[in-house]
Amino acid sequence: MQKEFAFFPGCVLSQAAIESKKSIEAIAPVLGIKLREIEGWSCCGASQAQCVDPLATLVANARNLALAEQMNLPVLTTCSTCLLMLTRAKAELDRGAKDQINSFLAKGNMSYQGTSEVTSLLWVLAQNVEELKSKVKKPLSNLKVAVFYGCHSLRPEKDLGFESSTNPTSFETIVKALGAQVVPFEKRLNCCGFHAVYPAESSAMKMTSGIINTAAKSEAHCVVTPCPLCQMQLDIYQEDAQKIAKSKERVPVLHLSQLVGLALGIPAKELGLNHNVIDATKLG
């Protein structure tokens, strides 16, 4: 297992999903991983910025990657949308945009060389699942889990390319290594609705409600996702979505790092479970 990474938290971990950052920082040393946060990182520009000014967004992400290169480390992020943006930027730069973008970076005495790879917590754990399994102190044998990949852990497959976007297995493999039971969950590859909340709130709420109700029907004790944006949508908006749907079902939604932490024997509070909106503290 790669032991040291240039950590790109992204905006959401710095504000709205502090429990995600708290939990990954709690599990990293137990797994023997050193996270060095990229000093001076900037927003990846997903959604708004990339639509308004794609060139500026590419420059910003080239800068983020260049900062990691200065650390001589691969980039690790837990946000699937950040993963997609950084991976796409690297691919575009490596295909020939590097010289143009470096002309902008040069104004800040920086340059992109293409030496740092981009990965995610999901991918790192999947690639080292036996090592993860060996560190489990509290097998989650009584826990039924609905795994929810979300969009940007898998799609577009041509940009990410880690595994099949229609028949992925990495997440299930990780959860089973933690000792938990993976329940059949037909919405595991669906969109959570996060990026539709503002332009199409009604549709987003239907997506959220459908996911939660399907998880409940599968008798899952919790939904777990590798993406903090998916977690926010399914957790923070769950109450509103279920009221609109007139559903009484409520299901805790965990970050992948929180589930891993429970299996490693880390106390629930250290994993930020008290920050989750739908009560998840009983799971720990």
Curated annotation (Swiss-Prot):
Function field: Membrane anchor subunit of 8-methylmenaquinol:fumarate reductase (MFR), that catalyzes the reduction of fumarate using 8-methylmenaquinol-6 as electron donor. The complex shows no succinate oxidation activity. Is involved in anaerobic metabolism. SdhE likely contains the quinol/quinone binding site.
Signal peptide residue numbers: none
Protein name per the record: 8-methylmenaquinol:fumarate reductase membrane anchor subunit
Membrane topology, from the record: Peripheral membrane protein
Assembly and oligomerization: The MFR complex is composed of three subunits: a flavoprotein (SdhA), an iron-sulfur protein (SdhB), and one hydrophobic anchor protein (SdhE).
Record gene name: sdhE
Catalytic activity: 8-methylmenaquinone-6 + succinate = 8-methylmenaquinol-6 + fumarate
EC numbers on record: 1.3.5.-
InterPro entries given in the database record: Cys_rich_dom (IPR004017), HdrB/HdrD_reductase (IPR051278), SdhE (IPR049951)
Cysteine disulfide links: none
GO cellular component, one term: plasma membrane
Keyword tags: Cell membrane, Electron transport, Membrane, Oxidoreductase, Periplasm, Transport
